[in-house]
A protein has these predicted regions:
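Conserved N-terminal ligand/cofactor-binding loop architecture of enzyme catalytic domains
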Residues: 42-124
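A short, active-site helix/loop in glycosyltransferases that binds the activated sugar's phosphate group
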Residues: 47, 201-228, 367, 423
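Membrane-proximal helix-turn-helix segments that form the acceptor-binding/catalytic region
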Residues: 130-133, 155, 159-163, 176, ...
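Carbohydrate-associated surface elements
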Residues: 215, 233-234
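Nucleotide-sugar-dependent
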Residues: 258-261, 312-314, 324-350, 356-368
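Conserved acidic donor-binding segment of nucleotide-sugar-dependent glycosyltransferases
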Residues: 343, 361, 372-383, 391-397
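A charged, aromatic-enriched C-terminal amphipathic alpha-helix characteristic of glycosyltransferases
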Residues: 380-383, 396-427
Length: 436
């Protein structure tokens, strides 16, 4: 192995979705692997998508429809994409055709769907799909597995590792292990126990385990008996010019997981709070289209809903605002769901120079992170929210202190070069035979 290859080993990425810069996962992977030669990265993925960004130039796709058809056609092959097949003119990588309805039904995360999908992959001919031959032709030094909540992708990762004789590194972006959303449903506990058996075997065999925040690393370290590394989400550190009069309060992003109700509660608290400077409206920017999720937002007289905006305008909207919101739900089930997750948008908000208002349960990893580092105006109850809002808009000394704390935290944990080096170091050490 050359000195360059020791530093930047050839990496086979295994994940469910294709690499695309217009998705959170794609942006994250773009940061992780920006130092690599594109020829030294290949991706194996599952979803019915086509490459739209040349983040690498070697892809192998084997989808659910392929798996289903291969039960009968045992030698059904997967699809190989090269640089010539990358469709940069397309904004959306999804390629569904007439299977959209079937696929969307299959995405419903019920115990029966989980078990049926995993059973289909067990019966399928994915081992004879050309996957191994394609991987051998790429000659990877190490596998980077972006873990998910379906057992079959863990088995694929172990299979390739064993057949190629190379180690794998697992990166846990979300909590699929402690939280079982289906525990009260028929077969929910049975399905989760089966999944955890496969996940534990795969985690035990990993050269390294990476997580996306220190809370997750600590908890997983105790549960799985392994040292877990932390690779923080990178933020945009580019300095923006000072704005003399920042105005307004904004929220940008997903409205699911109860965030719609939280935003409505914040707008109500703004209207009820006494004090100068509190804006009349909360401005919400989101690509959400589900009418049931949108209803609490659109019906609140204190919220102006703007829909989606282009990604290149997000920083400008945050920068011009006096405050940007991060929120998590108090709903008991959702609280457990997000307990160990850290929003990918927090890193950009920390670096923005705009004060953050964080509203949610104290035990959520994102809330705990901001509270511990005094990097936001935080409220963990409706009463505390009504108390903190006037201070956010009137106490300039506290505002400046919190903004500076946030920027310092961004520089410490969320610099793109730090994130890249953490991932590069983990993969290089794994390829060299080091295990933690």
């Amino acid at each position: 192995m050359s000195a360059e290859q020791k530093k930047y080993p050839r990496v086979l990425i295994v994940s469910h979705t294709v690499l695309a810069r217009n998705t959170s996962m794609g942006k994250t992977m773009d940061t992780y692997f920006s130092g690599w030669d594109r020829d030294a990265i290949a991706q194996l993925y599952i979803q019915s998508e086509i490459p739209t960004d040349p983040l690498c130039v070697n892809y192998f796709r084997f989808t659910d429809p392929d798996a289903l058809k291969s039960i009968v056609q045992r030698r059904r092959k997967g699809t190989v994409f090269t640089e010539a097949d990358v469709r940069t003119e397309r904004a959306d990588p999804v390629e569904m055709g007439n299977l959209t309805g079937v696929y969307n039904y299959g995405r419903k995360r019920t115990p029966l769907i989980f078990l049926a999908r995993d059973g289909m992959w067990r019966l399928s001919g994915w081992k004879h799909s050309g996957m191994l031959e394609w991987a051998k032709s790429f000659r990877p030094d190490v596998i980077f597995y972006a873990s998910g909540d379906y057992a079959f992708s863990y088995r694929i990762t172990r299979f390739l590792s064993e057949k190629l004789g190379i180690p794998y590194v697992i990166c846990c972006f979300d909590d699929f292990y402690l939280f079982n959303p289906n525990r009260d449903m028929f077969l929910g506990k049975f399905r989760h126990n089966r999944f955890m058996k496969t996940a534990r075997e795969t985690l035990d065999g990993a050269a390294k385990i990476l997580t996306v925040n220190d809370t997750m690393a600590e908890v997983y370290g105790r549960i799985f008996g392994r040292k877990c590394g932390v690779v923080w989400t990178a933020g945009n550190m580019t300095e923006m010019p000072e704005i003399p009069e920042k105005q307004g309060i904004v929220y940008l992003g997903d409205l699911g997981l109860g965030r719609n109700m939280q935003l409505s509660a914040i707008a109500d608290a703004m209207r009820e709070s006494e004090g100068p400077g509190i804006p009349e409206y909360l401005d919400v920017y989101s690509a959400e289209t589900n009418p049931d999720i949108l209803e609490p937002v659109k019906s609140n007289p204190g919220i102006r809903f703007h829909g989606a905006i282009p990604g290149n305008q997000v920083r400008e909207v945050i920068h011009r605002a006096k405050a940007v919101i991060h929120t998590e739900s108090f709903d008991p089930v959702i609280r457990e769901r997000v307990r160990y997750s850290l929003s990918t948008k927090i890193s950009d908000c920390l670096a923005s120079g705009t004060g953050m208002l964080a509203y949610g349960p104290a035990e959520a990893a994102s809330m705990d992170y901001l509270i511990r580092n005094e990097a936001a105006f935080t409220a963990t109850s409706p009463e505390e929210l009504r108390e903190v809002l006037p201070r956010l808009f009137t106490d300039e000394a506290e505002y400046r202190r919190i903004v500076e704390n946030a920027k310092a935290l961004a520089r410490k944990n969320h610099r793109p070069e730090t994130t890249r080096e953490t991932v590069r170091g983990a993969l290089a050490e794994a390829a060299a035979g080091k295990r933690e």
